[in-house]
């Protein structure tokens, strides 16, 4: 049975007991390069990785008010707090990935007339620093976890050109505390996305990798990378594209990587 049909069946079962939360919401994501689709099997440049956690989704109504979207929890890529969007398929240039593709965030909202979407790319603090060994899906993916102090990689993405490449892992850094008792992080590095033109049921959220790594040279034959370290100069440009001040880890600018299609 097609996965999308299973998603709709799960949404229907979710809504049988959801009181007024009876509006199915399905938000599709797609990877692009300068606006055109890109995948693991693309001719260079090709995608080598694109996975990220989404939390706190909300829809904007016609009166300018934001309304929560509740995650559907029947899917392996979501729990009640986060969804894992996975746009790589383990093929081609994504040899270090997985065959599973999770391209849609699925949930329900209260009935309404909506145009506008916002969400956070990141894991909420309490979950980010919980024990990953006892976490259930989608927080049990070891590829998405650093270590107990920093927690999860909120975003991991990579591109390969004909003879070069670049990858980036975004997550909290400068975290302090002990195992199970992290008290805070100097650079939270969570990414706030607001898309006022998003129309539920019609729009797709595009993540443009060319915009993300625009400050990196893909022709110098020297692969680059960024692991969110405060001393990594290679992080300054992609963090800026995400609207994050690399020095503080705070959202201080307007992101340009995520857009509406």
At which residue positions do the language-model features occur?
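Bacterial N-terminal signal peptides that target proteins for export
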Residues: 1-7
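General helical structural elements
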Residues: 7-8, 157
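C-terminal motif of bacterial Sec signal peptides marking the signal peptidase cleavage site
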Residues: 14-17
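A short, solvent-exposed, low-complexity linear motif enriched for acidic/polar residues
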Residues: 20-261
């Amino acid at each position: 049975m097609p996965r999308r049909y299973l998603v709709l069946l799960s949404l229907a079962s979710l809504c049988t007991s959801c009181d007024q939360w009876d509006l199915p919401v399905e938000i599709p994501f797609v990877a692009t390069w300068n606006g055109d689709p890109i995948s693991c099997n693309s001719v260079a440049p090709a995608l080598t990785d694109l996975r990220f956690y989404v939390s706190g989704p909300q829809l904007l109504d016609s009166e300018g008010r934001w309304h929560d979207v509740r995650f559907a929890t029947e899917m392996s890529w979501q729990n009640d707090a986060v969804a894992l969007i996975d746009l790589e398929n383990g093929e081609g240039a994504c040899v270090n990935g997985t065959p599973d593709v999770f391209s849609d965030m699925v949930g329900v909202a209260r009935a309404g007339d909506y145009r506008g979407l916002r969400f956070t790319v990141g894991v909420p603090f309490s979950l980010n620093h919980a024990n990953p060994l006892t976490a259930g899906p989608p927080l049990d993916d070891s590829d998405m976890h650093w270590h107990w102090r920093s927690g999860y990689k909120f975003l991991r993405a990579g591109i390969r050109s004909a003879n070069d490449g670049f990858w980036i892992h975004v997550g909290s850094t400068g975290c302090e505390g002990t195992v199970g008792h992290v008290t805070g992080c100097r650079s939270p590095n969570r990414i706030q996305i607001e898309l006022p033109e998003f129309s539920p049921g019609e729009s797709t959220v595009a993540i443009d990798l060319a915009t993300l790594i625009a400050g990196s040279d893909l022709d110098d034959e020297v692969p680059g990378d960024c692991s969110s370290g405060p001393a990594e100069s290679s992080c300054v440009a992609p963090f800026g594209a995400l609207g994050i001040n690399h020095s503080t880890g705070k959202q201080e600018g307007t992101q340009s990587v995520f857009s509406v299609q």
